[in-house]
C-alpha cells in the first residue's frame, strides 16, 4: 500500500477538477507544492508554485485560454502505490454561438505530495490537434 489512500487521492483529484472549473487560476496554482514541477510540452517546464501561477494566470486570461472554460475528465486512473493520477482531460472552448463543440484532449499525470498538494503535473498532447481545433472554433465564431 502507498502512503495515501485511494479515497484521499480521489478527493484531491475531485478538488483539482473543481478548481479548474471555477476558473480562478491563481487559486488553482495554490494546490501545488512550493517546489512543484509543471511540464507543458509547448510552453515549457515551470519550477515552483509561483512560476506555475504566473504561467497559468497569463495563459488562461488571454486567447485561446480565456475562451476555454470547460475541462471535462473522460476517465482517470488512480495509482495508489505511487500517489499518481493519470487522466484524459478535454479542453473545451465556450459555445461559439451555434451550439457546436470544439475541444481537444490531453493526458495529465499528477503526482500527489500529501496535505492537499500536488508536486508534479505533466500535460501530454498533440499541439497540432489543438491548433486544428482552435482554427475550427475561430472559423465558426468569426474571429
Regions found by a protein language model. Give the residues of each.
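Short, low-complexity N-terminal intrinsically disordered segments enriched in polar/charged residues
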Residues: 1-30, 34, 139-143
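A short local loop/turn or secondary-structure capping micro-motif enriched for an aromatic residue
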Residues: 47, 94-96, 127-131
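Exposed beta-sheet edge and beta->alpha loop/turn motif
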Residues: 88-114
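Short solvent-exposed loop/turn micro-motifs enriched in small/polar/acidic residues
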Residues: 11, 68-70, 102-104
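A solvent-exposed, acidic/Ser-Thr-rich amphipathic alpha-helical stretch
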Residues: 6-7, 25-83
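Short beta-strand edge/turn micro-motifs at domain boundaries
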Residues: 105-136
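Hydrophobic pocket/interface hotspot
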Residues: 16, 28-29, 36, 48, ...
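Hydrophobic alpha-helical core bundles mediating ligand binding, dimerization, or RNAP-core interactions
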Residues: 13-16, 20, 25, 32, ...
Amino acid at each position: 500500500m502507498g502512503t495515501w489512500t485511494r479515497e484521499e487521492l480521489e478527493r484531491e483529484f475531485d478538488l483539482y477538477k473543481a478548481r479548474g472549473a471555477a476558473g480562478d487560476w491563481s487559486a488553482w496554482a495554490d494546490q501545488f507544492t512550493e517546489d512543484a514541477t509543471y511540464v507543458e510540452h509547448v510552453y515549457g517546464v515551470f519550477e515552483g508554485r509561483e512560476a506555475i501561477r504566473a504561467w497559468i494566470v497569463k495563459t488562461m486570461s488571454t486567447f485561446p485560454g480565456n475562451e476555454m472554460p470547460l475541462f471535462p475528465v473522460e476517465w482517470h486512473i488512480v495509482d495508489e502505490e505511487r500517489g499518481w493520477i493519470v487522466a484524459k482531460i478535454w479542453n473545451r472552448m465556450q459555445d461559439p454561438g451555434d451550439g457546436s463543440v470544439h475541444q481537444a484532449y490531453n493526458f495529465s499525470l499528477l503526482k500527489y505530495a500529501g496535505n492537499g498538494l500536488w508536486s508534479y503535473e505533466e500535460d501530454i498532447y498533440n499541439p497540432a490537434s489543438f491548433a486544428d481545433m482552435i482554427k475550427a472554433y475561430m472559423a465558426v465564431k468569426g474571429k
